[in-house]
Amino acid sequence: MKIILLGAPGAGKGTQAQFMMNKFGIPQISTGDMFRAAIKEGTELGKQAKALMDEGKLVPDELTVALVKDRIAQPDCANGFLLDGFPRTIPQADALKDSGVKIDLVLEFDVADEVIVERMSGRRVHQPSGRTYHVVYNPPKVEGKDDVTGEDLIIRQDDKPETVLERLAIYHKQTKPLIAYYTAEAEAGNTRYERLDGTKPVEEVSAELAKILG
């Protein structure tokens, strides 16, 4: 099963990716992890990517697609994979298609912006341990304090409402067009497209996913 995950940051893709990895024994592939691995291993593509990144330049789509193709040709992807964070743009989706990679299923996690802002801006973190709380869904016993040590909890820069809104704006501009792209691909019979309501409880979303995946 070759799957693409679409959805804004905070839409719950990571949680459900974990569920699918365990169910099918397929790896989750994120471009960030791939770049780091290729650079660490000193592969030809890794060297090219590093040179560009060191200059503060964006890695071109062709290079990203080449890295993805390299990664999905590895033995652990024989039964499929989950692509998370790629493709991000229409040119990347086109390049992936042109390179001959057949995607079986595109899953969209649909969550309204205001829900995502509430989810992410409500997070509180105990930095030394990495323990995470949420003011609504998983509050600490004492407001603003870690349950174990009693130390202060912080709001990460990434979780501040203004940062979340910025990330959502980028998502809508760059990645939202992919929803129309893959809906059209599904209508043309080239893939299957399923939308999941990411506001439902985790277990419900997982149960729905299990049905879709058969």
UniProtKB/Swiss-Prot annotation:
It comes from the Bacteria. The keyword Kinase applies. Residues 30-59 are annotated as: NMP. Pathway: Purine metabolism; AMP biosynthesis via salvage pathway; AMP from ADP: step 1/1. AMP binds at T31, R36, K57, L58, V59, G85, F86, P87, R88, Q92, R156, R167. Its EC number is 2.7.4.3. ATP binds at G10, A11, G12, K13, G14, T15, R123, T132, Y133, K200. Residues 122-159 are annotated as: LID. GO terms for biological process: AMP salvage. Its main location: cytoplasm. The keyword Nucleotide-binding applies. One of its GO terms (molecular function) is ATP binding. Pfam families: ADK (PF00406), ADK_lid (PF05191). Keywords: ATP-binding, Cytoplasm, Kinase, Nucleotide biosynthesis, Nucleotide-binding, Transferase. InterPro entries: Adenyl_kin_sub, Adenylat/UMP-CMP_kin, Adenylat_kinase_CS, Adenylate_kinase_lid-dom, P-loop_NTPase. It catalyses: AMP + ATP = 2 ADP. It is found in: Cytoplasm. HAMAP family: Adenylate_kinase_Adk. Belongs to the adenylate kinase family. PANTHER family: NUCLEOTIDE KINASE (PTHR23359). Monomer. This is Adenylate kinase. It comes from Actinobacillus pleuropneumoniae serotype 5b (strain L20).
